[in-house]
UniProtKB/Swiss-Prot annotation:
PANTHER family in the cross-refs: PEPTIDYL-PROLYL CIS-TRANS ISOMERASE, PEPTIDYL-PROLYL CIS-TRANS ISOMERASE D-RELATED
EC class of the enzyme, as a word: isomerase
Family assignment from sequence similarity: Belongs to the cyclophilin-type PPIase family. PPIase D subfamily.
Natural source organism: Debaryomyces hansenii (strain ATCC 36239 / CBS 767 / BCRC 21394 / JCM 1990 / NBRC 0083 / IGC 2968)
Keyword field: Cytoplasm, Isomerase, Repeat, Rotamase, TPR repeat
Catalytic activity: [protein]-peptidylproline (omega=180) = [protein]-peptidylproline (omega=0)
SMART domains registered for this protein in UniProt: TPR
Protein's GO biological process: protein refolding
EC assignment: 5.2.1.8
UniProt keyword Repeat, yes or no: yes
Domain PPIase cyclophilin-type: from-to ranges: 11-176
One Pfam family hit: Pro_isomerase
Protein name: Peptidyl-prolyl cis-trans isomerase D
Length: 370
């Protein structure tokens, strides 16, 4: 029997949209489920060669994550079909459930996907939250020890039909690391000064019970976003403002002092408004509307900030081709700031667009009845 000190460590190098996203490292529980752990390890190295039955290489390299459900899990391992209907183990097409000693009690666990009892193949999933309803049904056999931020990015990617990512997230390379491999620190600077995980609760650098620790992290991300914006890196600026906003969305402190409550509200307003501004520059209506709506929900929002949020929300609706909602938001903004030239122009643009659309509809209808 193996022990914890000698647990195998394997890795996935993941890419999406033709760009590398980073490395995820797993520790496998071969001291508890040796057969299941060995299956995953060997599929990472590809050492078993081709399958005798299918002729496919028994290897995760080149396969995709085919099913992602936010606040649940990320599933992959179907290297034969890439859709969730295929894959096979190193022992044959399927093998039995080894045991259910380990439970799905935290995020970032590795567990076997299956089609019922004793149908384990090569498909696996990574939990992103505790999933106790899976206990006794799926075999837990490892955990993520490095690259949690990559898993969070994967979890939050755009999805299409059947929860499949719109862009393929590919295991571009995979293999085994030395058993004494030490995970690199989670606080790896991405080149912008951002040392934080994608989700605040995953980050050992942040004490969520200390408001100052949270505020420091959010302020750092916000400042990085501002620098990126000044440098002309608009997409990177949005990414940092949005990340800071995400930290605040996940922060539900109890018994904050009046001073800290004021700081929290000010940070929320600043991050949400900045995210809306940058999303507008990127001409992304949906993201603009979402960020501006978040700003409008902040308690004790002042009129100046409310005006900015309503204007940006209105312009977001215009980008999204919802002119009626755009007009409503901009008219509310104009009531707060009647002399604001940008709001007046925005309303003119909306009314012009509405008139052009209606004229086009009338013309089409007249042709229909002529």
């Amino acid at each position: 029997m193996s022990d914890k000190l000698n647990r195998p460590k394997v890795f996935f190098d993941i890419s999406a949209d033709g760009k590398p996203k980073g490395r995820v490292v797993f520790e496998l529980y071969n001291d508890v489920v040796p057969k299941t752990a060995e299956n995953f390890r060997a599929l990472c190295t590809g050492e078993k060669g081709a399958s005798e039955s299918s002729g496919k290489q028994l290897h995760y390299k080149g396969s995709i994550f085919h099913r992602i459900i936010k606040d649940f899990m990320c599933q992959g391992g179907d290297f034969t079909h890439g859709s969730g209907i295929g894959g096979e183990s190193i022992y044959g097409e399927k093998f039995e459930d080894e045991n259910f000693q380990l439970t799905h009690d935290k995020p970032f666990l590795l567990s076997m996907a299956n089609a019922g009892a004793n149908t384990n193949g090569s498909q696996f999933f990574i939990t992103t939250v505790p999933t106790p309803h899976l206990n006794g049904k799926h075999v837990v056999f490892g955990e993520v020890i490095q690259g949690k931020s990559i898993v969070r990015q994967l979890e939050r990617c755009d999805k299409g039909e059947n929860d499949k990512p719109v862009e393929d997230w590919i295991i571009s390379d995979c293999g085994e690391l030395p058993s004494d491999y030490v995970p690199v620190p989670t606080s790896v600077d991405d080149g912008t000064g951002d040392i934080y995980e994608e989700v605040m609760a995953d980050d050992d650098n942040i004490n969520v019970n200390d408001p100052e620790s949270v505020f420091k992290a959010v302020t750092t991300l916000k400042d990085i976003g501002t620098k990126q914006l000044k440098d002309g890196n608009v997409a990177a600026a949005y990414e940092k403002y949005n990340k800071a906003s995400g930290f605040l969305n996940d922060y539900f402190p109890e018994d904050l002092s009046e001073e800290n409550l004021s700081k929290l509200h000010a940070l929320k307003l600043s991050c949400y408004l900045n995210a809306a501004l940058v999303a507008l520059k990127l001409k992304d209506g949906k993201k603009t509307i979402n960020a501006a709506s978040n700003a409008l929900e902040v308690e004790a929002i002042d009129d100046k900030s409310k005006t900015k949020a309503l204007y940006r929300k209105g312009m977001g609706y215009l980008l999204a081709k919802d002119e009626e909602s755009a007009q409503k938001s901009l008219e509310e903004a104009l009531q707060l700031s009647p002399e604001d030239g940008a709001i007046i122009k925005g309303l003119q643009d909306v009314k012009t667009t509405i008139k052009a659309r209606r004229d086009k509809q009338k013309k089409a209808m007249s042709k229909f009845f002529s």
